[in-house]
Amino acid sequence: MRILEAAHIPYTCLEYAWDEDHLDAVSTAQKLGIEPETLFKTIVMISADNEVFVFCVPAPVSVSLKKVKSITGKKIIPLKLEALQQTTGYIRGGCSPVGMKKHFVTYIDETAQLYDHIYVSAGERGRMLCIAPADLQAICAAAFCDLTEAAAE
């Protein structure tokens, strides 16, 4: 949040009760009383040549590997959970696209632009940031792209 304050980017921080069994983004949206489509989970992926990518997608959907291969030009897979903290500085359920250990190429699903504000992790379990999509894009030097496929019903 210091990064946002230093850049004079407005945001609101929301807190919620969390537990190990309900760390998923849809459960978090329910706890906050917000539409799941406005809560963007942070997915960290890696290519065969160890390039790390960050994707922010709405809670109810999944990253389309076909689409991200088309966007990045690389076949990528999710980063192993054991490597998440060492790579990003964050843990599962508290991984924010803002303030990672290093700058990684970041993409935000284009649906974020439909909302005045979206929610992303504040970098720790139990805290979410409410931020304008354009401000998130600016602070992360991200691109808006079509990244998702509908979640299996």
Feature-to-residue mapping (PLM):
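Extended, low-hydrophobicity, polar/charged segments
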Residues: 1-153
